[in-house]
């Protein structure tokens, strides 16, 4: 598990324990400098939860990031890619995983729209926010 991840030994141990113990949270915030492996770690975690080798072939996985040429991740994008989909139960497996990369670009409206799902998610949903800092988020998100 997490063989492709270099370093991050403490995090690997923690997440392995969570997976084996069935103690999976509905939301995670991975933050830190660019290039330290946050997205790679999130994707490996998603692979473990979904029991797949290739996330792109899984119907239970969505990767969300800023659309090309856009300054922010806007409410319409969050509604379309996450909120409209989140209440459909997984077709296979126990989880639906949503990774929001560069989540610091979620504008205020998008954060507010996401808040209800973060506060009252379906039991099968895991949302992973990836950002350079926590300071970009509304206090209610953190």
Regions of interest found by a model, annotated:
Residues 102, 129-134:
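A short beta-strand-to-loop transition that corresponds to the Sensor-1 phosphate-sensing loop
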Residues 1-112, 116:
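Clamp-loader machinery-focused feature within the broader ASCE/P-loop NTPase space
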Residues 122-126:
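His-Asp phosphorelay/catalytic-motif detector in bacterial-type signaling
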Residues 106-107, 121, 136-137:
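Catalytic P-loop NTPase motifs of RecA-like helicase/translocase cores
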